[in-house]
């Protein structure tokens, strides 16, 4: 009779568990060594017991070299997988966008009245309903835009009207100030003209005009006459 099938589960008995670990560990390390020799493979095995004891095997090199190679190759494979996954993702995106573009192009051609030969009465009625709905939406949007523009124009008109009113007030103030200045200037001019038109001074019945002064420029005497006068005085 053959050996019965062993159930793979944790061994409860600690002694049996330790014996089984020792036997199978030795067998695993032996198989790893045989694999590296027979197949010229680089093999690294790391085992930790339940108590934390380390057992390892490295073929033809150190365990550090095998781990470094493992990490390097694992990273390369990860990058390749990511790159391949990214390519597949974008391929699916391109296919989906192409389908959407084709559908939108067909809808556009139908909306503009092209390629209607393959449509029945129901399809045409649905297309008409879509056009009516779209037209209502367009009109509603247009009315909304026009209403907004009218409100904006009214607002700007009110601002301009307010600015004009303020400017008119400033002009009125400046006009009043100008009138005041003109009155002051005319008053001073009239006063000056009145003073200059007063009658000459009167003394009883005789009127005396104010004397007019005239500057007389002295002329130098001739040289001979000066000499004579000098002799007479001497």
Swiss-Prot record:
Tissues expressing the protein: Specifically expressed in roots, mostly in lateral roots (LR) primordia, young emerging LRs, apex and base of LRs, apex of the primary root, and in the stele. Barely detectable in shoots.
Keyword flag Transcription: yes
Cellular localization per UniProt: Nucleus
InterPro entries: MADS-box/MEF2_TF, MEF2-like_N, TF_Kbox, TF_MADSbox, TF_MADSbox_sf
GO biological process entries: cellular response to nitrate; lateral root development; positive regulation of transcription by RNA polymerase II; response to nitrate; response to nutrient
SMART domains found in the cross-reference section: MADS (SM00432)
SUPFAM superfamilies assigned: SRF-like
Ranges that cross the membrane: none
Domain of life: Eukaryota
Keywords associated with the record: Developmental protein, DNA-binding, Nucleus, Transcription, Transcription regulation
Gene Ontology MF terms in the entry: DNA-binding transcription factor activity; protein dimerization activity; RNA polymerase II transcription regulatory region sequence-specific DNA binding; transcription cis-regulatory region binding
Cellular component terms (Gene Ontology): nucleus
Induction, per UniProt: Induced by nitrate in root cell culture,. In roots, seems induced by nitrogen (N) deprivation (e.g. nitrate free medium) but rapidly repressed by N re-supply (e.g. nitrate, glutamine and ammonium). Slight repression in shoots during nitrogen (N) deprivation.
Protein function: Probable transcription factor. Required for root plasticity in response to nitrate, NO(3)(-). Promotes lateral root growth in a NRT1.1-dependent manner.
Protein name as it appears in the record: MADS-box transcription factor ANR1
Species this chain originates from: Arabidopsis thaliana
């Amino acid at each position: 009779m053959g050996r019965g099938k062993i159930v793979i589960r944790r061994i409860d008995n600690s002694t049996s568990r330790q014996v089984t670990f020792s036997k199978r560990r030795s067998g695993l390390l032996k198989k790893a060594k045989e694999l590296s020799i027979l197949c010229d493979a680089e093999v690294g095995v790391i085992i930790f017991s339940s108590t934390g004891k380390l057992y390892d095997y490295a073929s033809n090199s150190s365990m550090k070299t095998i781990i470094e190679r493992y990490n390097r190759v694992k990273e390369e494979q990860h990058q390749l997988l990511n790159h391949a996954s990214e390519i597949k993702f974008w391929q699916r995106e391109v296919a989906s966008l192409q389908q959407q573009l084709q559908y939108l192009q067909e809808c556009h051609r139908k909306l503009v009245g092209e390629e209607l030969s393959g449509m029945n009465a129901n399809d045409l009625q649905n297309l008409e309903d879509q056009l009516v709905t779209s037209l209502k939406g367009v009109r509603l949007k247009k009315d909304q835009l026009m209403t907004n523009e009218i409100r904006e124009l009214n607002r700007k008109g009110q601002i301009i009207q307010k600015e004009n009113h303020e400017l008119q007030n400033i002009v009125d103030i400046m006009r009043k100030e100008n009138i005041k200045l003109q009155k002051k200037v005319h008053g001073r001019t009239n006063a000056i003209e009145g003073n200059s038109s007063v009658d000459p001074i009167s003394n009883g019945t005789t009127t005396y005009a104010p004397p007019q002064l005239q500057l007389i420029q002295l002329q130098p005497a001739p040289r001979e006459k000066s000499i004579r006068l000098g002799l007479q005085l001497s």
